[in-house]
């Protein structure tokens, strides 16, 4: 009986190992990766604007007491969930978590000596929901990221791929001028390929 159980356990282990080995060795069609990546890169420009650039269009006010402006009616998104859904259609869940922390929670950055009073500067959340209204924290023009990098998505090459992760090399332009090739990563998720690195 003991020998039978031992053989059964060994057989199960062998099957599991074979399945794991097969899953690790799965490779995806490069044309599929390139097509999906091109679409994701193009879609990332608008998402980058929401999180790093000028943000969603807002109804501005001259009232100096107001720290946030209401999102305009013609905005493509009007709730946190809509923004999150749009971001997750482009970026991986792991990278999207960084975006959500920055946009909806806020964070601190080191700006001085470790022991100084200004060692950490608190950056407020950019988007806040008050009841059923989404508002945006206006930021100074000089603090808006200059999103001037674009990509030649017709010339994407797959450098490597392993375990549902592909490394790409993509020619880029800065202000329309040819610049260096950028290394980007895409990962396979439950919903398909997603960017796992920023494109700005």
Where are these regions (language model features)?
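Bacterial N-terminal signal peptides that target proteins for export
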Residues: 2-12
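C-terminal motif of bacterial Sec signal peptides marking the signal peptidase cleavage site
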Residues: 20-23
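N-terminal hydrophobic targeting signals that begin at the initiator methionine
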Residues: 1-2, 25
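Mature, Sec-exported extracytoplasmic domains of Gram-positive
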Residues: 26-200
């Amino acid at each position: 009986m003991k020998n039978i159980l031992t053989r059964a356990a060994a057989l199960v282990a062998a099957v599991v190992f074979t399945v794991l080995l097969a899953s690790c060795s799965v490779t995806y069609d490069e044309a599929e990766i390139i097509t999906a990546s091109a679409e994701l890169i193009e879609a990332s420009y608008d998402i980058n604007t929401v999180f790093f650039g000028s943000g969603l269009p807002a109804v501005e006010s001259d009232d100096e007491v107001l720290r946030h402006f209401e999102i305009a009616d013609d905005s493509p998104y009007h709730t946190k969930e809509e923004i999150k859904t749009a971001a997750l259609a482009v970026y991986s869940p792991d990278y999207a978590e960084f975006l959500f922390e920055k946009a909806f929670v806020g964070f601190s950055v080191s700006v001085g000596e470790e022991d100084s009073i200004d060692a950490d500067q608190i950056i407020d959340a950019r988007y806040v929901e008050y009841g059923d209204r989404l508002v945006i924290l206006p930021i100074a023009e000089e603090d808006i990221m200059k999103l001037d990098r674009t990509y030649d998505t017709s010339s994407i090459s797959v450098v490597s791929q392993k375990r549902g992760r592909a490394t790409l090399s993509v020619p880029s332009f800065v202000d329309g001028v040819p610049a260096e090739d950028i290394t980007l990563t895409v990962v396979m998720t439950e919903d398909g390929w997603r960017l796992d690195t920023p494109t700005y």
